[in-house]
Structures are given as structure tokens and as C-alpha cells.
Amino acid sequence: MKDVAMLAGLAAMVTGGGAAAQDAPPEPGLELLYRSVVTLSPAVEVGETPRGTRRFIPITGGTFEGPEMRGEIMPMGWDWQLDTADGCTQIVADYFLKTDDGVIINVVNSGALCPPRDGKPPVPVRTSPVFEAPLGKYEWLNHGAYVGTLGFDPQATEPSVVITIYKAN
């Protein structure tokens, strides 16, 4: 009987009956998760591949801080980059956060850096991070939708990037 009621409710939503079908979900907003400064070693050129010119940049450390978490970027990881025929650079960074309470979280952050077209201003670099956190205090990271920004600090004294991550609410 429970299954019949659930199917009837689902049918009403699909066919437009009931309040659930008429109410649109609220637009998502963004909440700051953290801002990080990630330090880097010089790029290592791999060379031409069938997909484009490949390089990687070792991640050597850094820090992150936000309202719910803070800690360090562990000195292991890399930023794989691929220059493609359209002039863009595809990036996939794979690295680890270590929170101030000792939890290690994997981050795989991907995006694209593309040159401006037709005299337009440069497009801001946006990334799509995915987290893999152990069960416990930070497991909520495994189930969210996130967007990041990638930039540079002109005052930096060593090679680094500034990555700010937001959670969709």
C-alpha cells in the first residue's frame, strides 16, 4: 500500500497535479567554503600528445581557511594541464587538504583557462571541485555541489594560485 501511495504522489508531480509540481525549487545561492593559497613548483613540460600539449605543475603546499574548516594543503599533488587546439588550457588538479583537526580530504578540481575572444575581457576562471572526505565530521563534503574561482595574488612572494571554493545551497 505504501508503494501505491508513493507512485500516486510521483504521478501527480509528473502530470502537474498537486502543489509539488507547481512550486519551482528556489534558485541556488553560493556560500563561501574556503579560500586557499596553493604553492607550486615550476611546471614540468611533458610534450605533445594526441590531445594537445601536456604539462604538470607540482603542488608543494599552502593553506586554506573558511567558516567551517581550515588547515593546510599537503605537499603532494599536481595540476595536470592540457593546451588544446582552441587555445584553452584544461586543468585538473588533484591534491589533499589536511584540516586543523587532522582530517585528510582529497580534492579533484577541474576547469579551463581560455583566452579572451574578439576583444572581449578575459573570462573569469571557474572550476568544479569534487571532494572525497572520510566518514565523520567532514563527510558532508562528499554530497555537495561546489564551484571555485582561480586567481593569482600579485603580492605573492613564491609561485602560487588563489583558489576560492563556494558551496551551492
Task: List where the protein language model places each region.
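Bacterial N-terminal signal peptides that target proteins for export
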Residues: 1-7
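Cleavable N-terminal signal peptides
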Residues: 8-9, 19
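Beta-strand-enriched cores of mature, soluble protein domains
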Residues: 21-169
